[in-house]
């Protein structure tokens, strides 16, 4: 299954600034243009995968600024239980282990009318990818207590790195350099929680208008840890 949609509204800032005649007065007053083209497809075989590609553009004809995403990519895979057979009950810590995968990729440009689709525009582009794999499981302990464990692994790929230097007293700014080249870094976190459900009933007597009130309490405790990568 795939879908495609497009809405394109692109123009020259010079044309819109020079549109003083009555026929184009609406164009002159409307100083923002935007476009979007998207394609999505679902691959149904197990595990199913969703893919979407989007190209977008936003333009201000007064300031001549243009922001583009060319393209934005999203990939997501359905949740998998690697230790449980499909269609069978998932009981216990091992059979309940599950994970999925997602990918986000963006290619962004911040440019102007003058540099539109020029080498300068492409040289200033920013490209990055983020891979995410959340893993979790849940199970019963002591018969009435539910426990869950989860962790998430994230890895970022980038093709430009900004290196900051000491404060420059002459310019009054922190000097920075943009270094071209592939780099990557990973982050992860871990969490766990314990919880149970307690039921109780207050009886007031059968001769009362309100004979009983049933209450439910769900106490829980959780802990999360994210290591520092400074």
Regions found by a protein language model. Name each.
Residues 1-230:
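Outer-membrane beta-barrel proteins and related beta-barrel translocases across Gram-negative bacteria
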């Amino acid at each position: 299954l795939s879908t495609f949609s497009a809405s394109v509204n692109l123009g020259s800032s010079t044309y819109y600034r020079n549109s003083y005649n009555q026929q184009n007065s609406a164009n002159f007053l409307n100083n923002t243009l935007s476009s979007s083209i998207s394609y999505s497809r679902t691959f149904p075989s197990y595990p199913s995968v969703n893919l979407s590609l989007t190209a977008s553009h936003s333009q201000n004809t007064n300031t001549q600024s243009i922001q583009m995403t060319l393209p934005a990519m999203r990939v997501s895979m359905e949740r998998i239980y690697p230790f449980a057979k499909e269609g069978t009950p998932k009981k216990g810590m091992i059979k309940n282990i599950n994970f999925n995968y997602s990918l986000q990729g963006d290619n962004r440009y911040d440019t102007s009318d003058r540099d539109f689709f020029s080498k300068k525009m492409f040289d200033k582009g920013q490209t990055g990818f983020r891979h995410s794999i959340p893993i979790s499981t849940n199970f019963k302990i002591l018969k009435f207590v539910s426990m869950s464990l989860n962790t998430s692994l994230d890895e970022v790929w980038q093709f430009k790195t900004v290196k900051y230097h000491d404060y420059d007293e002459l310019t009054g700014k922190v000097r920075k350099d943009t270094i071209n080249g592939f780099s990557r870094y990973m982050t992860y976190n871990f969490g766990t929680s314990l919880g149970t459900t307690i039921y109780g009933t207050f009886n007031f007597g059968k001769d009362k208008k309100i004979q009983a009130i049933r209450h439910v309490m769900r106490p829980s405790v959780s802990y999360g840890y994210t290591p520092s990568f400074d």
